[in-house]
Amino acid sequence: QKPKIFFTLHMGCVDILIFVLSELLSQIDVLYTPAKNKTLENKLFKIRQRQGGKMFPATPSGVKNLFRNFLNKNNVLIASDLVPHEKGVYEKFFDKECFCIDLVEKLSKKGTHDLHFIYLTKGEQKKYKVVCKKIKNKITTAEMNKYFEDAILTAPELYYWEYKKFRKLRPNKSNIY
C-alpha cells in the first residue's frame, strides 16, 4: 500500500483533521504555520503532536525536513490554501489570480504517494463532516484550487477568509485589502 499525501484548506477546524488522520494512520507528517504567540504555539504544538502527528513548521528547514520524510514514504498533510512567503505560482482562485503554494503539485508529480483531498464541511447531526476524496496521482495547482472552490461552495461560512488569499498579487497589481 502506497503512502498518502493529504491536502486540505482552512475550513472548519484543521486540527480535527490532524487528530482524525493521526488516529487512522500509524504516522502523519503535518506542515503548519506556527502561531506568533510563543506560549500559545508551545501548547498547540504539544496538543497536535500528542495524537501522533509530527509537526513541521512552514519554514525552509521545516519544508526540507518534511520533504526528507516524504522521500522515506511518510504520509503527509498540507493545508495548501495559504499564501506562500516566497516560492509559489500565480493561479486562479474564484476567477481571480493569486499567489499559491505549489508544493502539492510538486510532491504529486513524484508518483510515490496516493493523493487525497480532505476537508471539513457542515455536518447534519454533528458540527462537521469529514470529506475525503481520492484524487489522480498528479495534480496541478490550478486543479487543487478548483477542489478548494468546490469545497468552499458547500459551506462558505466555514472558510477562513481572514487569511486574505489575494494579498500577494503580481507587482503591477494593487493589494485589494
Question: What kind of feature is each model-predicted range?
Answer:
Residues 2-60, 86-92, 96-98, 111:
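Catalytic core of membrane glycerolipid acyltransferases/transacylases, capturing the structured
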